Swiss-Prot record:
It comes from the Bacteria. The gene is rpsB. HAMAP family: Ribosomal_uS2_B (MF_00291_B). Belongs to the universal ribosomal protein uS2 family. This is Small ribosomal subunit protein uS2. CDD domains: RPS2. One of its GO terms (biological process) is translation. It comes from Shewanella pealeana (strain ATCC 700345 / ANG-SQ1). PROSITE patterns: RIBOSOMAL_S2_1, RIBOSOMAL_S2_2. GO terms for molecular function: structural constituent of ribosome. Keywords: Ribonucleoprotein, Ribosomal protein. The keyword ATP-binding does not apply. GO terms for cellular component: cytosolic small ribosomal subunit.
Length: 242
């Protein structure tokens, strides 16, 4: 099972929160103290809470569940995409479009348009258009790919969303809450933990911290998917040779 240790977190700087003047009092239970005007997060809480979240994600993946990685701020977007792709899951790394979950029917139409344009770009359709029309469609394709590329093969709502930066992604969290989709989120000392099923109190700005979260969640999803494949193989009558 994927787990993260106190040492891993210390090395990644997970314990460094925001400046004390920007704190959210709702995070008080997870704060150890302050040093040089910066809140220090109590990793005695974060370690078990993160490992519980990883076990939950692994369990979701073991049942063929869909995990949606969400991180649209600059520090998180690249790591979010890499991690989701590495474990065959889904991601939003550019901008959260309002209604992405709650208005899925409309989003699905946009995904259909994206896939149509992708087909046109490779089957020669663009070559038959005027330069202006081809350019317009290329721009539309790029725009849709940026917004929806990470969910174009999701085929329905996710079973859990994993969020880096609860304050930045509050719209995504609210939509998931409205639909009863569980939320796993990294919550820094300046954010509210409300509406989050699995709170991970930790630094949501440092690249090393973000990579620790995203890579661990990807590993948990892979491990869960491996369990699912092992069960499937057993059901299909495949047994590994000694």
């Amino acid at each position: 099972m994927t787990t993260v240790s106190m040492r891993d977190m210390l090395q990644a700087g997970v314990h460094f929160g925001h400046q004390t003047r920007y704190w959210n009092p709702k995070m008080k239970p997870f704060i150890f103290g302050a040093r040089n005007g910066v809140h220090i997060i109590n990793l005695e809480h974060t370690v078990p809470m993160f490992n519980e979240a990883l076990a939950f994600i692994s369990n979701v993946a073991s049942k063929k569940g869909k995990v949606l990685f969400v991180g649209t701020k600059r520090a998180a977007s690249e790591a979010i995409k890499e991690a989701a792709v590495s474990c065959d899951q889904y991601y939003v790394d550019h901008r959260w479009l309002g209604g992405m979950l709650t208005n899925w029917k409309t989003v699905r139409q946009s995904i259909k348009r994206l896939k149509d344009l992708e087909s046109q770009s490779v089957d020669g359709t663009f070559d038959k258009l005027t330069k202006k029309e081809a350019l317009m469609r290329t721009r539309e394709l790029d725009k849709l790919e940026k917004s929806l590329g990470g969910i174009k093969n999701m085929a329905g709502l996710p079973d859990v969303i994993f969020v880096i930066g609860a304050d930045h992604e509050h719209i995504a969290i609210k939509e998931a809450n409205n639909l009863g989709i569980p939320v796993v989120a990294v919550v820094d000392t300046n954010s509210s933990p409300d509406g989050i099923n699995y709170i991970i109190p930790g630094n949501d700005d440092a690249m090393r911290s973000i990579r620790l979260y995203t890579q661990s969640v990807a590993a948990a999803a892979k491990a869960g998917r491996g369990q699912d494949l092992a069960v499937q193989a057993e059901q299909d009558g495949f047994v590994e040779a000694e």
